[in-house]
Amino acid sequence: FLRN
C-alpha cells in the first residue's frame, strides 16, 4: 500500500 505504500507505493500502490
Swiss-Prot record:
Cellular compartments per GO CC: extracellular region
Keyword Translocase annotated: no
Organism domain of life: Eukaryota
Compartment(s) where it occurs, according to its Swiss-Prot or TrEMBL record: Secreted
Entry keyword set: Amidation, Neuropeptide, Secreted
One biological process term in Gene Ontology: neuropeptide signaling pathway
Chain positions found as Asparagine amide: N4
Residues with PTM 3-phenyllactic acid: F1
Tissue expression pattern: Neuron specific.
Protein name: Antho-RNamide
Source species of the chain: Anthopleura elegantissima (Green aggregating anemone)
